[in-house]
């Protein structure tokens, strides 16, 4: 690893590459460039025939303006999250924050779906499955069974599932 070096030029020969920095010149047969967001390097690569895909933000939380989750700030629970009308889906701990949702699953969606979400101008609908692997129909059947078994109880008082009671109270 070399530090304090700045790429000055890139040359592509028939079977080699030459990279000139502010301190020395390197030659190699194969070259991998990790440019980050350096427009100077992008321009150099464009000059030798490469195209640069416009960068978009990645690894971001979802800003959700919805009163239904406002009272749930601080709750964390495992969930499966889908971005509707796409193939984007991820599971993991989901954290409800003061301005939306975060956590490993959300960050994974924002990373793998960065281009798709940017194309949607960050306006999209998510579907959160708090029961992870259960389908809608399976969940509905389970809730009907619980209703029959506990018909005389107030269902909002105790969650029959493995997630926080405050979340259950909000859902009921």
Please place each PLM-identified region on the residue numbering.
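Short, basic, helix/turn surface patches
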Residues: 3, 25, 77-87
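Short loop/edge segments at beta-strand edges and connector loops
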Residues: 3-5, 21, 54-56
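A conserved short coil-to-beta-strand element within the FAD-binding core of flavoproteins
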Residues: 3-16
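Short hydrophobic core segments
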Residues: 7, 19, 24-38, 44-46, ...
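Glycine-rich nucleotide phosphate-binding loop and flanking beta-alpha elements
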Residues: 9, 38-40, 103, 113
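Short secondary-structure boundary/hinge segments and terminal tails
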Residues: 10-12, 62-64, 100, 114
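Residue-level recognition of phosphate/Mg2+-coordinating polar/acidic sites
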Residues: 20, 82-172
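Central beta-strand plus flanking loop segment that forms part of the substrate or channel wall
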Residues: 40-41, 46-81
């Amino acid at each position: 690893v070399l530090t304090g070096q700045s790429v000055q030029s890139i040359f592509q020969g028939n079977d080699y590459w030459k990279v000139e920095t502010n301190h020395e010149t390197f030659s190699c047969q194969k070259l991998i460039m990790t440019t980050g967001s350096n427009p100077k390097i992008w321009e150099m690569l464009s000059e030798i025939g490469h195209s640069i895909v416009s960068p978009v933000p990645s690894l971001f939380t979802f800003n959700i303006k919805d009163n239904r989750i406002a009272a749930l700030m601080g709750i964390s629970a495992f969930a499966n999250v889908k971005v509707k009308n796409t193939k984007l889906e991820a599971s993991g701990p989901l954290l409800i924050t003061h301005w939306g949702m975060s956590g490993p699953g959300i960050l994974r969606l924002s990373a793998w779906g960065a281009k798709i979400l940017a194309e949607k101008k960050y306006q999209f609908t998510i579907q959160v499955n708090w029961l992870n692997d259960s389908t809608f129909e399976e969940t509905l059947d389970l809730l009907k069974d619980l209703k029959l078994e506990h018909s005389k109880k107030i269902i909002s008082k105790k969650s029959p599932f493995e997630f926080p009671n405050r979340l259950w109270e909000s859902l009921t």
